[in-house]
Curated annotation (Swiss-Prot):
Keywords: ATP synthesis, CF(1), Hydrogen ion transport, Ion transport, Membrane, Mitochondrion, Mitochondrion inner membrane, Transport
Functional summary from the UniProt entry: Mitochondrial membrane ATP synthase (F(1)F(0) ATP synthase or Complex V) produces ATP from ADP in the presence of a proton gradient across the membrane which is generated by electron transport complexes of the respiratory chain. F-type ATPases consist of two structural domains, F(1) - containing the extramembraneous catalytic core, and F(0) - containing the membrane proton channel, linked together by a central stalk and a peripheral stalk. During catalysis, ATP synthesis in the catalytic domain of F(1) is coupled via a rotary mechanism of the central stalk subunits to proton translocation.
Subunit structure: F-type ATPases have 2 components, CF(1) - the catalytic core - and CF(0) - the membrane proton channel. CF(1) has five subunits: alpha(3), beta(3), gamma(1), delta(1), epsilon(1). CF(0) has three main subunits: a, b and c.
Subcellular location: Mitochondrion; Mitochondrion inner membrane
Species name: Ipomoea batatas
Matches recorded under CDD domains: F1-ATPase_epsilon (cd12153)
GO cellular component, one term: proton-transporting ATP synthase complex
Pfam families to which the protein is assigned, alphabetical: ATP-synt_Eps (PF04627)
Record Gene3D superfamilies: ATP synthase, F1 complex, epsilon subunit superfamily, mitochondrial
Name of the protein in its database record: ATP synthase subunit epsilon, mitochondrial
């Protein structure tokens, strides 16, 4: 069994790597000066579509856009 000394600090803090990397990315974006900050924040948007399945068949897809803000 591995010792606790080898555990990454993000895991020791109770975070997943995705949570840790998102936190770091937000800090870097907030350190940027304008107009670079606005450009970086505009790339943070996410667009995706999803379909609910009923009786083994997909329903009409819904399109969703998230800004990345919680």
């Amino acid at each position: 069994m591995a010792s606790n000394a080898a555990v990454p600090f993000w895991r020791a803090a109770g975070m997943t790597y995705i949570t840790y990397s998102n936190l770091c990315a937000n800090m870097v974006r907030n350190c940027l000066k304008e107009p670079y900050r606005a450009e970086a924040l505009s790339r943070e948007k996410v667009h995706f579509s999803f379909s609910k399945w009923v009786d083994g068949k997909p329903q009409k897809p819904a399109i969703r856009s998230d800004t990345g803000e919680e």
